[in-house]
């Protein structure tokens, strides 16, 4: 088993992550490969302490130059040697010392399963009430199709069957974990264990913090990476028309969100996303074209049904009023009784 982790300026959180790794009780060998991306705080020193304390467990990679999240993650994946891969970033942590044992036991018993995950507790540093992810409504469908539509697997909950190489992960893919989930899932099945065995933090220094606090900033900084992720996913589902259509639908949404960025910066970002990711853009357009006739039909149908309903209502009202001696289609004004009847059915 290879535990792969990345860190950058996480001195406040890294000990809990490392303690969670060291606490795992297993009957199989485990290695922890943690790559620090040239942190400027005490994170490298703390990692070094754990490597000295558990020399048979930790394989630290302490960079002197920052290479970025994508390159750091890709490199640590390539360094793994285990049959299985478990992911956990330096600001999250595990709470169950049997987490890995439970997941490996399941995978060993179900060779058709390539992705095994579990719910996580989400804690908020702004004081908001804790929650669980994925929400209950998302747990009903654990198919690859559902995973393409929305990422329901939290990074620090997942264990994969390791693939021979990760050198071909496309550049700029972000979120890389969503891409990895799909990459492993298309070769088998997805399973979720019921226990909540990890904690995911939402804090101001997190990579995805702006996704929840500042949507404009999120799409300005992460929109191109989202587009790159969807473009890369097309290689994973190539030839599967239904799944390509799902990617097209998500792509249409991503381009709409990028397009909402105001000013020249927004236009430039949208044009760059379109130019750099033509297949994703084409599928997005195909999705919109496919939706347009249906939307027209629905609008027309809605109008016609409304007209029929209005006609039926008017006919019924006239029949009732005629039966009660009320208003009839004449040039005479309605009587008092007619007004009462009309009022009671309006």
Swiss-Prot record:
Q: Where is this region: Disordered?
A: 322-346
GO BP: any one term: biosynthetic process
Give the organism, scientific name.
Mycobacterium tuberculosis (strain ATCC 25618 / H37Rv)
GO CC terms, sorted: peptidoglycan-based cell wall; plasma membrane
An example Gene Ontology molecular-function term: hexosyltransferase activity
Q: Which Gene3D superfamilies match?
A: Spore Coat Polysaccharide Biosynthesis Protein SpsA, Chain A (3.90.550.10)
Q: What is the lineage of its organism?
A: Bacteria, Bacillati, Actinomycetota, Actinomycetes, Mycobacteriales
What is the name of this protein?
A: Uncharacterized protein Rv1520
Q: Which Pfam families match?
A: Glycos_transf_2 (PF00535)
